[in-house]
Amino acid sequence: MLTITAIKAFNDNYIWVLQQTPHSQVYVVDPGDAKVVIAYLVSHQLALAGILLTHHHQDHTGGVGELKRYVEQTSSQTLQVYGPQKENIAHVNVPLNPEMRTELTLPFLNAQIQVLNVPGHTAGHIAYFIEDALFCGDTLFSAGCGRLFEGTAEQMLSSLTLLAKLPANTRVFCAHEYTLSNLKFALTVEPNNLNLQAYMQKATEMRAQNSATIPSSIALERAINPFLRVGEQSIIDSIKQHFDDPDPIKLDELTCFTRLRQWKDIF
């Protein structure tokens, strides 16, 4: 059975730990902080088998070097570090090109992992899909999506469209607890969305109890995430009103997404 556990890091990061019981070897996703990972490994008597990286940003990769040294000192093994080939991340020794290699089989996990090409937030951003779990870094957030630091709006829309087509029961493990702020924006865009209203209440209660709102699900995101709903008339009307666009012609999805991202950037 695959178990997935969150390690909190920095202000709002989640580092995900993947373990297939009864194995004591685990993988971690996007370890920006080595110290919290090592503390978790020691307290749970676990060994680190590998690291999965989604993109190059420091809050996702900053702990890799120290974790590599830790594994070499404690087990004399070479740590397997998987990451996007396009981004030349330090310590990655298994570079992944999702255009050439779309599946991985990792020791101790006993499951096929699909490697997905999801550029937008960064030029080479990738995601990992294992069983019913998606590890999507900073591409898809609950009720939101990542900023466009290196990629284009067209790339990000394509990436989000790809993720939205995953099975509805897919659990979404993004890397940040941004849900409440994203929901505030989503409700500004689509104030009459009953699913949004209900989830804002639920998420507010969860955060008041210091509970994580992650994982989300693809089904939930289809219902509440404005960036997955750019074809909905309610979203289109809101964008046209915000940007004072009287043109009666329906905006295409790319234009809607581009304007929605611009709106969110200054929200």
UniProtKB/Swiss-Prot annotation:
Residues annotated for Zn(2+) 1 binding in this entry? 55, 57, 121, 138
Q: Which InterPro entries match?
A: Clx_II_MBL, Glyoxalase_II_hydrolase, HAGH_C, Hydroxyacylglutathione_Hdrlase, Metallo-B-lactamas, RibonucZ/Hydroxyglut_hydro
For this protein, what is the EC number?
3.1.2.6
Q: Which first-to-last residue range defines the signal peptide?
A: none
Recorded catalytic activity of this chain's protein: an S-(2-hydroxyacyl)glutathione + H2O = a 2-hydroxy carboxylate + glutathione + H(+)
Record GO biological process: methylglyoxal catabolic process to D-lactate via S-lactoyl-glutathione
Which key words are in the record? Hydrolase, Metal-binding, Zinc
What pathway is it annotated to? Secondary metabolite metabolism; methylglyoxal degradation; (R)-lactate from methylglyoxal: step 2/2
Summarize where Zn(2+) 2 binds, as residue positions: 59-60, 138, 176
State the top-level EC class. hydrolase
What cofactor does its activity depend on? Zn(2+)
Q: How are cofactors bound according to the entry's free-text note?
A: Binds 2 Zn(2+) ions per subunit.
* Pfam families reported in the protein's UniProt record: HAGH_C, Lactamase_B
GO MF terms, alphabetically ordered? hydroxyacylglutathione hydrolase activity; metal ion binding
Family named by the database record: Belongs to the metallo-beta-lactamase superfamily. Glyoxalase II family.
Q: What does this protein do?
A: Thiolesterase that catalyzes the hydrolysis of S-D-lactoyl-glutathione to form glutathione and D-lactic acid.
Q: How does it assemble?
A: Monomer.
NCBIfam families reported in the protein's UniProt record: GSH_gloB
Q: What is this protein called?
A: Hydroxyacylglutathione hydrolase
Give the organism, scientific name: Shewanella putrefaciens (strain CN-32 / ATCC BAA-453)
Q: Which gene encodes it?
A: gloB
